[in-house]
Amino acid sequence: EDLIRANNFDMDSIRRTVVDRYDQPDDIKEEIAKWYEELIEMMRSEGVMEKGHIQLNKNVIIALTDLHLRLLKSPKEMVYGAAYYKTLPFIVQLRAKSGGEDLPELETCFNAIYGFLMLKMQGKEISPETMEGIKQISSFLALLAEKYREDMNGELKLEE
């Protein structure tokens, strides 16, 4: 959403600054561009052109948070729990630095990845400490994404 806002909802600009940077064949880049066009339409129709998130993004965070809590409660998901507790100090540190104590943990993780991508796009230097945190958060989110895929495919069994 912020990339769209930064490009003033201009698809030509989004193609130049975002889509063309993907190392993908032209047909995939065209799909990515179409996805951005659809996001622009959603942002306009939902009135979040200046700030805020479209409902789709809010729903994804809600679904991921629900899954996250179920995974933490499940005795079958010790690896997930360990990954979360390994990531937690970075989440706490990020919240303290950003003043985002009220944000859900997963939103803090996504904000960290977003901030990292923005720094990279701006060509700014990234400290080793930040890289360590981003690597751990990325690893944790990758595990959550895999569990989400399993859950959506009916393959995740969390009986307690």
Predicted ranges, named:
Residues 1-50:
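N-terminal interaction modules that seed assembly of large macromolecular complexes
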Residues 92-160:
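Glycine-rich, aromatic-bearing surface loops/beta-hairpins
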